[in-house]
Amino acid sequence: MERGPVVGAGLGARARIRTLLGCLVKVLLWVASALLYFGSEQAARLLGSPCLRRLYHAWLAAVVIFGPLLQFHVNPRTIFASHGNFFNIKFVNSAWGWTCTFLGGFVLLVVFLATRRVAVTARHLSRLVVGAAVWRGAGRAFLLIEDLTGSCFEPLPQGLLLHELPDRRSRLAAGHQWRGYTVSSHTFLLTFCCLLMAEEAAVFAKYLAHGLPAGAPLRLVFLLNVLLLGLWNFLLLCTVIYFHQYTHKVVGAAVGTFAWYLTYGSWYHQPWSPGSPGHGLFTHPSRKHN
């Protein structure tokens, strides 16, 4: 006979719990939205500063030139000292794939939302095609340098026996070793990706200043690119500390910087190029973004 009031009380309690959970979810979503808005605004302002962008080049140079000195002050047994560590396998070895995926999504959204023109969007995305060509071309050039400067060695109990055999592929298949000048492809790629991402992401500050659509998806994609840029900086530091010879790292970073200069610093400012980041997107005077 008393089940009616008990059941009613139970239903009322569950309803209150659902209401509280609904309110909690709304609060969490509001906090997440506020953090997303604030974080994207601050990151855009930071990356869009011309002064800080110039300092960023100096930062990368300092990392490559002076970073190897830290090898005397760090634990040589840390996980980052192993070639087989998770970050080296999953991120560094596929750095261009990660960069192209994240940055491609960002460029696609920014350009299309700003212009609503497929042709302009495709033109800006072609910078990533050029970047892929630079990456592939540099990799082949590094292998050619190693072939031209190398010699074949056969491991023996007493040491190494030098062979006057120029065919590197057949010598490696026979179990011999090929030693030549090896430009650090990881240092090259991470340096190039850092400079490229910093250049592309800097456009977001001007995008916001012009009051263009900047919803949560775009802001999230932008912040993911910022996080990836931070990861590349960290992994570049790990690379110069733990791996490769000093000159190999410096040359790799120098080639990456030179590749950035030839493209973003020179060619992309010409009319017969893919265009520099932000070119042709902002045709109206900027206004404060609310």
Swiss-Prot record:
Question: What residue ranges lie in the Cytoplasmic compartment?
Answer: 40-54, 116-141, 209-220, 271-290
Give the GO cellular component terms, alphabetically: endoplasmic reticulum membrane
| Active-site residues per Swiss-Prot or TrEMBL entry | 186, 244
Query: Main localisation, per the record?
Result: endoplasmic reticulum
| InterPro entries documented for this protein | FIT, FIT1, FITM1/2
* UniProtKB keywords: Endoplasmic reticulum, Lipid metabolism, Membrane, Transmembrane, Transmembrane helix
Membrane-spanning regions, if any?
A: 19-39, 55-75, 95-115, 142-162, 188-208, 221-241, 250-270
The UniProt entry lists membrane topology as: Multi-pass membrane protein
Site annotation Important for catalytic activity: residues? 248
Its localization reads: Endoplasmic reticulum membrane
Query: Topological domain, Lumenal: which ranges?
Result: 1-18, 76-94, 163-187, 242-249
GO BP field:
lipid droplet formation; lipid droplet organization; lipid storage; phospholipid biosynthetic process
- Annotated GO MF terms: coenzyme A diphosphatase activity; diacylglycerol binding; triglyceride binding
Q: Which residues form the signal peptide?
A: none
Q: What does the similarity note say?
A: Belongs to the FIT family. FIT1 subfamily.
- Sum up the protein's function in the record's words: Plays an important role in the formation of lipid droplets (LDs) which are storage organelles at the center of lipid and energy homeostasis. Directly binds to diacylglycerol (DAGs) and triacylglycerol.
Protein name, UniProt field: Fat storage-inducing transmembrane protein 1
To which species is this protein native? Sus scrofa (Pig)
Name the lineage. Answer: Eukaryota, Metazoa, Chordata, Craniata, Vertebrata
